[in-house]
Amino acid sequence: MSTLANLTEVLFRLDFDPDTAVYHYRGQTLSRLQCRTYILSQASQLARLLKPGDRVVLALNDSPSLACLFLACIAVGAIPAVINPKSREQALADIAADCQASLVVREADAPSLSGPLAPLTLRAAAGRPLLDDFSLDALVGPADLDWSAFHRQDPAAACFLQYTSGSTGAPKGVMHSLRNTLGFCRAFATELLALQAGDRLYSIPKMFFGYGMGNSLFFPWFSGASALLDDTWPSPERVLENLVAFRPRVLFGVPAIYASLRPQARELLSSVRLAFSAGSPLPRGEFEFWAAHGLEICDGIGATEVGHVFLANRPGQARADSTGLPLPGYECRLVDREGHTIEEAGRQGVLLVRGPGLSPGYWRASEEQQARFAGGWYRTGDLFERDESGAYRHCGREDDLFKVNGRWVVPTQVEQAICRHLPEVSEAVLVPTCRLHDGLRPTLFVTLATPLDDNQILLAQRIDQHLAEQIPSHMLPSQLHVLPALPRNDNGKLARAELRHLADTLYHDNLPEERAC
């Protein structure tokens, strides 16, 4: 695709019945024609307010209004970025400053940003209307119902931003173009899942998460399916309500959500025919629980820098403890610490990926940041090993590794050994603790599948006995802590940094004692 084009216009021209549903919201259904008319109307107003290339931060809950405003921004050549509406004020201000936003759109009760560089702020209407005008009528006058002046540009140019979750540092703005957006839509929605008109999609992850944005915002337009949008936070109770009322055929979740839905297995299984998990590796126990109930969960991994999922299990062929194969059009390879490609199976390395969803790069990137895209490959920072069949297994992240007495500790090796063979442990996380006299030592945090029948010391002894048979001694945990739940960020990803801080705090609070086991 070399001619100038506009992503919103391209999505509108896909050959689907305009009267079919595209979004479901608060018990109401919106057709493709209704949304298209509204987007064009809103674009005519935004064109009086914004110039092509202006950045717009959308800190809004999931709704048709958010999806339509996003596509209206792209229609006029503005560059929208959807962020978590629950972001702290400083985080929002930092993102607005980073992208030099001209406009911020927030929920009705959210304050305006202050300071000398504060952008114009619009607010959603109270009461959550089906389609919100965000006060544009009052600001720039009535809409032009005949507007069609799409801003067309190079298909490789940035047309929206996604900010990373910040799990590996400050959030970075990832640029996405028409070309790579259609690339990840085609690879995942069409080639992998074969989504089609009539499919009902429910993504529990929200649109501010790249995984959720593809599922809820883009795939309905791209595949002819329709999606449920929910402006409330996804508690297990709320998710159950949505499953019962909406009866989705395709469910997108993260491992923690599937774990929380175990008591509602009957309701989930009554309609869901295709379940997908991403965000963090799906534990073997979770895969096996749902498989025993007749539901195959396909695990996969994506990255904001690649738009969506690029490595996944195929429906009908999913395996436990496997992240699957590269999606059509993608290539993956593993490299060692020196950057040499690893050819042999069973050897661990850092995953590099290239393919149709690859981002053009970071917004205002430093040289160090942009180096992650060197040579047309994105360095994910994730550790994998590849088996003889070509399937990949996740082994953690390269920044999770640490040394004890000069020897590398691989946390996932310990974590998986525990979760596979000790059914009383639901989740396990190994992090380093800096001790006063002997440097870094491993600290283990666990959550339990069932309450302890005995004390924690006996649990620690069972863990030690099991690990001693298969794990090198320098990886054995020196402390054990049982938690009711593990900390996670807004995308459902494990917050290891919080656990490292907690481990240090607990160690220093309990000096001079060490756990005895």
UniProtKB/Swiss-Prot annotation:
Effect of pH on activity: Optimum pH is 8.5.
Class of this enzyme: ligase
Keywords, comma-separated and alphabetical: ATP-binding, Ligase, Nucleotide-binding
Binding site for AMP: L161, Q162, Y163, T164, S165, G166, S167, T168, G169, A170, P171, K172
Database matches in SUPFAM superfamilies: Acetyl-CoA synthetase-like
Molecular-function GO terms, alphabetical: acid-thiol ligase activity; anthranilate-CoA ligase activity; ATP binding
Signal sequence range: none
Stored CDD domains: BCL_like
Reported consequences of knocking out the gene: Mutants show no detectable levels of 2,4-dihydroxyquinoline (DHQ) or other quinolines.
Gene Ontology biological process terms from the UniProt entry: secondary metabolite biosynthetic process
Homology family: Belongs to the ATP-dependent AMP-binding enzyme family.
Quaternary structure, from the entry: Monomer.
Purpose of the protein: Catalyzes the formation of anthraniloyl-CoA, which is the priming step for entry into the Pseudomonas quinolone signal (PQS) biosynthetic pathway. Also active on a variety of aromatic substrates, including benzoate and chloro and fluoro derivatives of anthranilate.
Name of this chain's protein: Anthranilate--CoA ligase
Name of the encoding gene: pqsA
